[in-house]
Amino acid sequence: MFSFDLSERRSGRYEGVNGIFTCPVPTTSTKREEMKTSLRGSAETLLPSGPQITMVSSSTTVDASGLSYGGNTLLGLGADRDPERSAKLGGNKSQESERSAENAQTVKRNPQVTERPDSEQQPQIYPWMTKLHMNHESEGKRSRTSYTRYQTLELEKEFHFNRYLSRRRRIEIAHNLCLNERQIKIWFQNRRMKWKKDSKIKVKE
């Protein structure tokens, strides 16, 4: 690019790497050739061989084979300059991958931890919730024993002769009537209460 100044002399403006400067252009052809060769030599000295990326604002050159941004290695230049940091980053990545793999294995091995069974999801029913729908019988109360006609007759005969039974006789009657000792004992208690009640009524009359 050429421009004419006030002294009517041609001057050339050359855009350098870090700035812009002007130089006078010679009029003769020999001087022009010398100027061209000198400019080529200076350009070769300024720009070394090999692909480079020039940044005018920061005045820093970075090799095209690798870029470094914010201290973090992007391609390969950072690894060449700082092998210890790259080794640490690689070790951290491998540890993170191993941890994620272990977590996935634990989840696969223990699916019951994450998934709750249907029994836990259903609301728990407490005894007091269904107490209103139950019978009015007290808890722990035994069912009433029903005696056959033959058993009742045999017990009445024994009560007629003996109001109170010894334990030996009570065990013998229970064995004969296919009852237990407790049932025989309760029957005789109830029968004595009834007998006393009837005797009181007869006395009053």
Curated annotation (Swiss-Prot):
Sequence-specific transcription factor which is part of a developmental regulatory system that provides cells with specific positional identities on the anterior-posterior axis. It comes from the Eukaryota. The gene is hoxc5a. Residues 140-199 bind DNA. One of its GO terms (molecular function) is RNA polymerase II cis-regulatory region sequence-specific DNA binding. It is found in: Nucleus. This is Homeobox protein Hox-C5a. Belongs to the Antp homeobox family. InterPro entries: Antp_homeobox_Deformed_sf, HD, HD_metazoa, Homeobox_antennapedia, Homeobox_Antennapedia_CS, Homeobox_CS, Homeodomain-like_sf. Residues 75-123 are annotated as: Disordered. The keyword RNA-binding does not apply. It comes from Takifugu rubripes (Japanese pufferfish). One of its GO terms (cellular component) is nucleoplasm. Residues 102-113 have a biased composition (Polar residues).
